[in-house]
């Protein structure tokens, strides 16, 4: 009858006689010099240490960071610049991998150069190539890729549209790095190029200059239907009331004079006047005259309307200067209020 789990005796007497009690387990089994990755469940290739001290393959961390910027074990956030500046446990292995163990190595195309595959993927590609296979699958950064050894391209198994060239070449050709990790000799220059191109920092000075120039130019403003720039002084807003009333008076006179002219005679009007005639107010004048006869209108309004009637219905043979002299040098002009009442201002 089998004994239960609780009946098993794990005492020191159960140990073999050739093993001492104080002997550690590491002496009985070979120690693992390369840590294991908790993502791919294999020995780490180019192991990196996160700020939380967990160790993974560089490509495994890269693939996990695309899905979420957190550690796969403790869920602590991964810094944004970790992929550009990873903490390698053994930087010397990267240089050794770039030198390679054989005569040939496998590369995939990058921007402005070639990247060397990591050691594990290179062994898989070399094994498939030596066996004459047409294609093989690779697990890279958490994604399954298909390497077409006939056309020498690679693509994701679930996305055939994105293809990248691959090649088998000698180990000593110029390269950007290994498995996305740049070599030390190119790190400084490449980081500067990345900072000036990826984030648009190189275009900031030009954009700032353009923005200052564009902000200094204000849009044109409209004054009485005419476009004026901010630098151009606007028309004098403090024009005296006398000029405005004189303008209205001359406009009324021109309307009265044009009523006695034939059609087409307005074209021969003297250009020295240079003034735009005021709109026709005959209807308003008629309404004001009719309201002066009602009992609700005050005597002051009636007096103003009579004065305006005398001004707006002049003798055709009398000029403006004659009327001004006859009135003793005083010109009275009617102005209409918003409430419909009329006032007369003496100039």
Curated annotation (Swiss-Prot):
Gene3D superfamilies: 3.30.720.50, Zinc/RING finger domain, C3HC4 (zinc finger). The keyword Zinc applies. It catalyses: S-ubiquitinyl-[E2 ubiquitin-conjugating enzyme]-L-cysteine + [acceptor protein]-L-lysine = [E2 ubiquitin-conjugating enzyme]-L-cysteine + N(6)-ubiquitinyl-[acceptor protein]-L-lysine. Residues 203-217 have a biased composition (Low complexity). Pathway: Protein modification; protein ubiquitination. The modification Phosphoserine is found at residues 288, 292. Its main location: cytoplasm. The keyword Lipid biosynthesis does not apply. GO terms for biological process: positive regulation of canonical Wnt signaling pathway; protein autoubiquitination; protein K48-linked ubiquitination; ubiquitin-dependent protein catabolic process; Wnt signaling pathway. A zinc finger (RING-type) spans 37-75. This is E3 ubiquitin-protein ligase RNF146-B. It comes from Bos taurus (Bovine).
């Amino acid at each position: 009858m089998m004994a239960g789990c609780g009946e098993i005796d794990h005492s020191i007497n159960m140990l073999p006689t050739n093993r001492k009690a104080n002997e550690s387990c590491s002496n009985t089994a070979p120690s693992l010099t390369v840590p294991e990755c908790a993502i791919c469940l294999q020995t780490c290739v180019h192991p990196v240490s996160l700020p939380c001290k967990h160790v993974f393959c560089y490509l495994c961390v890269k693939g996990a960071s695309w899905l979420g910027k957190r550690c796969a074990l403790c869920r602590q956030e991964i810094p944004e610049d970790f992929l550009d500046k990873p903490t390698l446990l053994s930087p010397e292995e990267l240089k050794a991998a770039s030198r390679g163990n054989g005569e040939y190595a496998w590369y995939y195309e990058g921007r402005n150069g070639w990247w060397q595959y990591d050691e594990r993927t290179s062994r898989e590609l070399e094994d498939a190539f030596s066996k004459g296979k047409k294609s093989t699958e690779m697990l890279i950064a958490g994604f399954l890729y298909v390497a077409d050894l006939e056309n020498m391209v690679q693509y994701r198994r679930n996305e055939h549209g994105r293809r990248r060239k691959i090649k088998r070449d000698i180990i000593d050709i110029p390269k950007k790095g290994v498995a996305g990790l740049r070599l030390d000799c190119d790190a400084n220059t490449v980081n500067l190029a990345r900072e000036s191109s990826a984030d648009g920092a190189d275009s900031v000075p030009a954009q700032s200059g353009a923005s200052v120039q564009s902000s200094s130019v204000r849009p044109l403003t409209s004054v009485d239907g005419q476009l004026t720039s901010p630098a151009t002084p606007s028309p004098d807003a403090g024009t005296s009331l006398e000029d405005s009333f004189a303008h209205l008076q001359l406009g009324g006179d021109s309307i009265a004079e044009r009523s006695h002219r034939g059609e087409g005679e307005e074209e021969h009007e003297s250009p020295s006047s240079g003034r735009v005639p005021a709109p026709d107010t005959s209807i308003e004048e008629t309404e004001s005259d009719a309201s002066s006869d009602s009992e609700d209108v005050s005597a002051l309004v009636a007096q103003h309307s009579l004065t305006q009637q005398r001004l707006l219905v002049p003798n055709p043979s009398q000029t403006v200067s004659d009327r001004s002299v006859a009135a003793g040098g005083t010109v009275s002009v009617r102005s209409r209020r918003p409430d419909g009442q009329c006032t007369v201002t003496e100039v």
